Amino acid sequence: LSTFSASVNLGSSTYYRNSYNQQNSANFLNNTLSSSISYSRTFPSYPSVNLSLTASHSQNTNTQSIQMTLPAMRVSMERIYPFAKEGTPKKGMIKNINFNYSLQGDNRYDTSDRDFFSKKMFDKGQTGFRHSIPISTNFKILKFVSMSLNTSLDEVWQFKTVKYHDYDELTGKVRKDTINGFSRYMTYNFGTSLGTTIYGTFNFGKDKKIQAIRHVMRPSVSYGYTPSFD
């Protein structure tokens, strides 16, 4: 299954600034243009995968600024239980282990009318990818207590790195350099929680208008840890 949609509204800032005649007065007053083209497809075989590609553009004809995403990519895979057979009950810590995968990729440009689709525009582009794999499981302990464990692994790929230097007293700014080249870094976190459900009933007597009130309490405790990568 795939879908495609497009809405394109692109123009020259010079044309819109020079549109003083009555026929184009609406164009002159409307100083923002935007476009979007998207394609999505679902691959149904197990595990199913969703893919979407989007190209977008936003333009201000007064300031001549243009922001583009060319393209934005999203990939997501359905949740998998690697230790449980499909269609069978998932009981216990091992059979309940599950994970999925997602990918986000963006290619962004911040440019102007003058540099539109020029080498300068492409040289200033920013490209990055983020891979995410959340893993979790849940199970019963002591018969009435539910426990869950989860962790998430994230890895970022980038093709430009900004290196900051000491404060420059002459310019009054922190000097920075943009270094071209592939780099990557990973982050992860871990969490766990314990919880149970307690039921109780207050009886007031059968001769009362309100004979009983049933209450439910769900106490829980959780802990999360994210290591520092400074």
List the model feature ranges, each with a label.
Residues L1-D230:
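Outer-membrane beta-barrel proteins and related beta-barrel translocases across Gram-negative bacteria
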